[in-house]
């Protein structure tokens, strides 16, 4: 299994790190924008020799071609949307990550770069687009269509046929 790069150095990246590790992924490191502040918890992870912090200007494809977007979506989806487009064009494999503590119907379809956190429940005939966050404890009932670049926030409930 190739190591995974986490693009982002904030709180959401910390949450992504934990799920990736719990699901057995090896982490290549975190990638930060040149002007991005680094979450203090990431500095703690960086004290481990196998976890590094890279700059977006590094030759990242030499490190790994697998990636997740570790920036959240608090105010707008534009930063995630733009990063997804850039990484896709650069040839990165934006992997889907599904916590083993989530409950996902086998009749669910997923786009690329989907991240499903712990205790999420996704029922039958749900379609989830590219670059989506299905956050901790959220529920998506039957026959829902979650478009590209959506964030179903912590504890959200989306009833059927939405």
Roles of regions detected by a PLM:
Residues 11-12, 75-78, 109, 128:
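Short alpha-helical
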Residues 39-99, 103:
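Phosphate-bearing ligand-interacting subdomains
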Residues 1-48, 54-61:
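Hydrophobic, well-ordered beta-alpha structural blocks that scaffold small-molecule cofactor pockets
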Residues 96-162:
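Structural signal for interior beta-strand "rungs" in well-ordered beta-sheet cores
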């Amino acid at each position: 299994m190739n190591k995974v790069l986490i693009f982002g150095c904030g709180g959401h990246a910390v949450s992504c790190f934990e799920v990736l590790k719990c699901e057995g992924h090896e982490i290549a490191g975190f990638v930060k924008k040149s002007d991005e502040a680094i979450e203090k918890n990431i500095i703690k992870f960086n004290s481990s020799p196998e976890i590094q912090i890279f700059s977006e200007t590094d030759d990242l494809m030499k490190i790994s071609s697998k990636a997740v977007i570790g920036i959240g979506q608090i105010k707008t989806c534009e930063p995630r949307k733009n990063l997804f487009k850039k990484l896709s064009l650069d040839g990165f494999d934006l992997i889907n990550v599904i916590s083993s503590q989530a409950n996902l119907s086998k009749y669910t379809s997923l786009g690329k770069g989907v991240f499903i956190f712990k205790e999420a429940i996704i029922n039958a005939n749900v379609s989830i687009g590219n670059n989506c966050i299905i956050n901790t404890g959220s529920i998506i009932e039957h026959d829902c269509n979650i478009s590209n670049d959506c964030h179903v926030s912590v504890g959200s409930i989306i009833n059927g046929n939405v």
